[in-house]
Structure formats: structure tokens, C-alpha cells
Amino acid sequence: MDFVMKQALGGATKDMGKMLGGDEEKDPDAEKKEEERLEALRQAEEERAGKYAKMEAEREVMRQGIRDKYGIKKKEEKEAEAMAAMEAQAEGSLTRPKKAIPAGCGDEDEEEESILDTVLKYLPGPLQDMFKK
């Protein structure tokens, strides 16, 4: 079997052992090269992070300029002011304003009647008379 494989592959059998995980020649400088590669990757990542931080700072300066120009507040500032206003109103007050009832909360009865009427339309005449009484 080995003979057939050697004949079929020719001179590539020497490299075949290396491909299959056999004896690999160790490069004496491989460890040093790997350290240099990792150091270069780390430096590239630091540079990228620095550029990104600088870019974000420039964007924030531009955003703040637009906010100042048009009198727009940041979302966090709006929320903080709203919370402070709510606390100021509610502190020590027994008569604080109640939460507003959303529209449509008391309209459930009308909806139920309309659903019942809709169902009654599809029933035969004698059954409609029974349910109407």
C-alpha cells in the first residue's frame, strides 16, 4: 500500500507527513516572530481605539454645538429635570396630582355591546329574538 501511495503522489510524500501533523521543522525564530506579531496587533488595536475615541469626541463636540444652537437638551438632561420636577411636586404633599387616565380606559362596555351585536347579526332569527330578550 505504501508503494502505491508513493508512486501515485511522487515526491510529495515528504510534505504529506508535515501536512498530516507529522514531524515539523521548528523555526528557531518562530517564537520571536510570534511575539513581534502579537505586539504589532496590540499596537494596531490601541491606535484604532485612539482614533475611534478622538472621532467620537469630535462628534460629541459637533452634537453639542447643534444642541446649543437650536436649544435642544440631551435626553438624560430632560429625564433628570422631569424627575426633579416630579419629586419637588410630590414632596410632603398629600394632594399631589393623580396620574391621568389614558383615553379609552372606560370605553370597554361600548366595545362589548358592539361585539355582541355583531355576533347576533350572524345568528338565525329565532336565536336573535332569544338573546334580545
Swiss-Prot record:
The record's SUPFAM superfamilies line, in alphabetical order, gives: SNARE fusion complex
Species name for this entry? Narke japonica
Keyword annotations of the record: Coiled coil, Cytoplasm, Exocytosis, Neurotransmitter transport, Transport
Give the UniProt family note: Belongs to the complexin/synaphin family.
Query: Which tissues does the record link to its expression?
Result: Nervous system. Present in electric organ (at protein level).
What GO cellular component entries does it have? cytosol; SNARE complex; terminal bouton
**Region spans: Disordered:** 1-40, 85-112
Q: Which GO terms describe its molecular function?
A: syntaxin binding
Compartment(s): Cytoplasm, Cytosol
Q: Name one Pfam family in it.
A: Synaphin
Q: What is the lineage of its organism?
A: Eukaryota, Metazoa, Chordata, Craniata, Vertebrata
Please give the superkingdom of this protein's source: Eukaryota
* GO annotation terms (biological process): regulation of neurotransmitter secretion; synaptic vesicle exocytosis
Name the job this protein performs.
Positively regulates a late step in synaptic vesicle exocytosis.
Quaternary organization: Binds to the SNARE core complex containing SNAP25, VAMP2 and syntaxin-1.
Q: According to the UniProt record, which cysteines are disulfide-bonded?
A: none
Q: What is its main location?
A: cytoplasm
PANTHER family from the xrefs? COMPLEXIN (PTHR16705), COMPLEXIN-1 (PTHR16705:SF6)
What protein does this entry describe? Answer: Complexin-1
Q: Where is the composition biased (Basic and acidic residues)?
A: 15-40
Q: Which residues form a coiled coil?
A: 28-60
